[in-house]
Design a protein with these regions (language model features):
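Active-site cofactor/substrate anionic-group-binding motifs, chiefly glycine-
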Residues: 1
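ATP-dependent carboxylate-amine ligase
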Residues: 7-173
């Protein structure tokens, strides 16, 4: 955010805005919701809400980000990527490979196409006891409430239509 704010301030200066106008713009700026929103829960669990949209590339980037965190355990809660047409199976399987490549500790999935993520992660060597598939969001919420621990980071990533943001909102309450 800092680098983006500096760039915006520079552009504002070039366009003739006053320092007060630039400062006010930066103070009142709000990031887009459901895109890498980070919240720390009272129990010490970090929630990363990236549930606004999902493509293979954004899944890949989010998993890479999660893998780089200094967390006790890295938990990826992944759902379907919509609008992939004939490439859906292939791209969901590639996400499963990315989960293993990025050394995610626990994989939690929901959605018809997310089954391909689960199957490929297992095929690529992720231990079966670290991979969970649920039929609905309520089961995911219950699982995270009961299993996420102090120091864990939990990424929520799916197409907006999966409504994973509802899980995040319930966990934050």
């Amino acid at each position: 955010f800092v680098y983006n704010a500096l760039c915006a301030a520079t552009v504002g200066t070039l366009l003739g805005l006053s320092k007060e106008q630039i400062e006010n713009g930066i103070k009142t700026f709000e990031l887009t919701k459901k895109r890498m929103d980070i919240t720390e829960l009272k129990n010490g669990v970090t929630i990363i809400n990236d549930s606004y949209n999902a493509s293979f590339e954004s899944m890949q980037a989010s998993l890479k980000y999660l893998s780089g965190l200094n967390a006790k355990r890295k938990i990826a809660v992944l759902g379907d990527m919509f609008e992939l047409g004939e490439y859906s199976k292939e791209l969901h399987e590639k996400v499963g490979k990315e989960v293993v490549k990025n050394k995610i500790d626990i994989l939690v999935c929901c959605g018809d196409s997310a089954k391909y993520i689960v199957n490929m992660a297992k095929k690529e060597g992720m231990p079966k006891e670290k991979v969970f598939y649920f039929d609905n969001k309520e089961q995911i919420e219950k699982f995270i409430r009961e299993n996420a621990q102090n120091g864990d980071s939990v990424l929520f990533k799916a197409s907006n239509g999966m409504k994973f943001f509802n899980i995040v909102e319930n966990l934050i309450k």
